[in-house]
């Protein structure tokens, strides 16, 4: 180091071994630089040193933090001295309003402030939190709607608020009447009438609320389906402004495709939201239906075929565990209504429906992401969308139930639902039955006639039931209703009963084909044929007659134990039909030409015990009075009457019962 007179040694760092030697000129230069830097690095707001560029102005760290905090409550800052306060290093905390205004005057820009940049980082969630959306606490959250809606974009908030307003409008009613008494609406038979003139529904909407307050009545199921159809129409009408101009045909197409899925989804989602009972399904009229609806209701209408049980197991249980929120329900309702694949939707509307549906799907995903506690919100979002496949399947089953109910339900036909499903028209079947019967009668007359004498083993046909009388009064119906009538029974009958009627008509036509000739059948009771006529059979047959051993007869008659085989002749006045006119057993109806029995009389008369009453009735008593068979002609024995028959009399033994050959001959005699 040099040791000149104008030089001096300056130790700038006493604790350091580094020694810097400056001469007088260098020291003066350094002092001038320090003075200039101290004057230029002062805060322009309060005058503090060590200022830097913050938010577009030279300011200290204190004024920087103050400006960022003051932006959050800028509207709450007020000055008591009319904005004339002095802002300095010592007095900068006296008035917040004047300090904030000076920050703005010095050029600090609020647009440069990024909120929550300096906030402490959020604690990382533990690794043991919910990983999927399948556990019970996946849908529980303590966030309010205002908290998570702030994190959504303006467009999503607008869509969500629009859907919530639509749901409130649809659920709210404008009448105090009961649904079962108001629906179905009279004078409204087509969807086009409502779509073209929506004013017809004013004052005809009942309030919809899903609560397990009481069990629904059987007659209320029809009104519930009708009310849900009006709700589907309201949803489509409310969404149409978001799609632009829609033609009536496009609206009808969207209503037809969304009616059943919308009803199934709301039944299940609202039940999971309002009730915790696993065996009830809430409806929209403050009522519910039980799981075993088929046992509790006579007519299940659109909820039959196990639909309630499937809905409770496959949808309600899933939604209840998941915890569906009101915001999620309205988004799904809108997605169900906006079906781009609906039948008869125009091509120009297809792209609009797809675009709006995608926007609603993004809104639904944002809701799931902000509300759910699950770290995988995409899994929860996927569960909601996958449930729509089950909703569609149950909706198809409900549509089939409604179509069947329109034809065969006791609650009658609803023209509006008929127009919804497009049922086919069929003329009443009771007119066709008469035409078929007439054709069968003509066909039977043309066939070859059959003789009864050849039908020795005839079995009685089944007894035909009486036809049910139709009660449809065509004159009282309107001409428009006569042109469009569903297939329905004349009265409240089941389909099995109607099929029985058709089968009985076929049986009656078969009887007509037999061509019974009642004019050739004589009355055996009035004619009283003789005993010889009783034993007479058609020519060609052999009769073996057995006489009881306890009866004394003439010498020309065989004694007990002997048999006589003879071939008697048939009188010319006796026809073959005479042999079918013997009296029936007691308790059986008489056999005549105008009656079709359900008892096989020829087989019945083959029983030998039928004739064990000879000694107890008038016929054997008249024979016993003669005491001599030689004095009585063989043709004077009366025909046995049909009163006082005694079966299986124990006091009269007959030896011919032990002889199988004689017994068969005895059977042939009376069976023919």
UniProtKB/Swiss-Prot annotation:
Q: Which SMART domains does UniProt cross-reference here?
A: HOLI, ZnF_C4
Which regions are flagged for Low complexity bias?
A: 1-19, 562-577
Among PANTHER family, the record links this protein to:
NUCLEAR HORMONE RECEPTOR FAMILY MEMBER NHR-31-RELATED, NUCLEAR HORMONE RECEPTOR FAMILY MEMBER NHR-5
Arranged from A to Z, the UniProt key words for this protein are: DNA-binding, Metal-binding, Nucleus, Receptor, Transcription, Transcription regulation, Zinc, Zinc-finger
Q: Where, subcellularly, is it found?
A: Nucleus
What family classification does the UniProt entry report for this protein? Belongs to the nuclear hormone receptor family.
Top-rank taxon: Eukaryota
Q: What does this protein do?
A: Orphan nuclear receptor.
Q: Which residues bind DNA?
A: 40-115
Keyword Membrane carried by entry = no
* Ranges for domain NR LBD: 155-424
Q: What is the name attached to this protein's record?
A: Nuclear hormone receptor family member nhr-5
Which taxonomic lineage does the organism of this UniProt entry have?
Eukaryota, Metazoa, Ecdysozoa, Nematoda, Chromadorea
Q: Which organism is it from?
A: Caenorhabditis elegans
Can you quote a single GO CC term?
A: nucleus
Residue span of region Disordered: 1-38, 550-577
Q: A Gene Ontology molecular-function term?
A: DNA-binding transcription factor activity
Question: Where exactly are the zinc fingers annotated as NR C4-type?
Answer: 43-63, 79-98
